[in-house]
Curated annotation (Swiss-Prot):
Family label: Belongs to the bacterial ribosomal protein bL28 family.
Gene that encodes the chain: rpmB
Keywords, alphabetical: Ribonucleoprotein, Ribosomal protein
InterPro entries: Ribosomal_bL28, Ribosomal_bL28/bL31-like_sf, Ribosomal_bL28_bact-type, Ribosomal_bL28_sf
Protein name per Swiss-Prot or TrEMBL: Large ribosomal subunit protein bL28
GO BP terms: translation
Protein source organism: Borrelia duttonii (strain Ly)
Organism lineage: Bacteria, Pseudomonadati, Spirochaetota, Spirochaetia, Spirochaetales
Amino acid sequence: MGRECEITGKRTMFGNNVPRKGLAKKKGGAGQHIGVKTKRTFKVNLINKKFFIPELGKNVSIKISASTLRSISKVGLNVFLKKNNKKIDDFI
């Protein structure tokens, strides 16, 4: 599957590095000047996490992003999977 969250589908995104120099006009300067834009990647913070499923009596290993882990810890795995139209059977 590569670098992708198995629940939310978050994956690597692409963008630009934008170097800025100079003091902002608001702070009394001549204004910020933007240099040459260069391409960069924004990678997902992925974690291999094991969850215990009491209904099945098994541990399930899922590759998820850190933000997904925070959401799961707030609402619970079953609620979060239902919200994202996934089932536990997809990960067994």
